[in-house]
Swiss-Prot record:
Keywords annotated in UniProt: DNA replication, DNA-binding
Organism (species): Thermococcus gammatolerans (strain DSM 15229 / JCM 11827 / EJ3)
Subunit comment: Homotrimer. The subunits circularize to form a toroid; DNA passes through its center. Replication factor C (RFC) is required to load the toroid on the DNA.
Function: Sliding clamp subunit that acts as a moving platform for DNA processing. Responsible for tethering the catalytic subunit of DNA polymerase and other proteins to DNA during high-speed replication.
Alphabetized InterPro entries for the sequence: DNA_clamp_sf, Pr_cel_nuc_antig, Pr_cel_nuc_antig_C, Pr_cel_nuc_antig_CS, Pr_cel_nuc_antig_N
Family assignment from sequence similarity: Belongs to the PCNA family.
Gene Ontology biological process: leading strand elongation; regulation of DNA replication
Keyword DNA-binding: yes
Protein name, as recorded: DNA polymerase sliding clamp
GO MF entry, a single one: DNA polymerase processivity factor activity
UniProt xrefs under Pfam families: PCNA_C, PCNA_N
Amino acid sequence: MPFEIVFDGAKEFADLIATASNLIDEAAFKITEEGVSMRAMDPSRVVLIDLNLPESIFSKYEVEEPETIGINMDHFKKILKRGKSKDTLILRKGDENFLEITFEGTAKRTFRLPLIDVEELELELPELPFTAKVVLLGEVLKEAIKDASLVSDSLKFIAKEDEFTMKAEGETNEVEIKLTLEDEGLLDLEVEEETRSAYGISYLADMVKGIGKADEVTLRFGTEMPLQMDYFIRDEGKLTFLLAPRVEE
């Protein structure tokens, strides 16, 4: 069998895939001895997604030889949503062109997902000269995006030495969420210079769907530069988004 991968906690893995599937229709997953990785760009080429899951976060990880498999993300998401929090998730691939997805809990349930041909693009995650780094709780970011969606289709991030502000302005109303390090929701703030940039709310909303309320989210950005959003999965795995800015006229 080319590979067998076991992850304890099917729902956590499902949330991860659901977040990526909000932005991309299909993806090429690289399965190597080191772990599972995927890098893709949404069809409009506004956001890049980078997923890295080292073998150490899995309870069992056996790979005979490196392989890249193409997956329809919507179909994968729908199957994974059938898993429960306490279910063990088992991903297997034999010699046939199927991914076998098994949930072990009160019963053993197995799905077979046909693999597809996906064009592998050479995508780089660039090192950018960000001037602001913000670490905050997932709940704070998710609620700010919901608040902002009531008044605008873009959300402005403003980082100063001692405060981080998220602001949205509509034709008739506006909303502002302000945080300092005295607030429980802001965990860290590093600012080289006052930094301002705006981003599309629809993309931000998709990017945070799989983030838990207590998860730590790291934002890195510069003035009118892309936003890099990172959050960790079991300390060592990481999901990264790189979102193009909404340049204001």
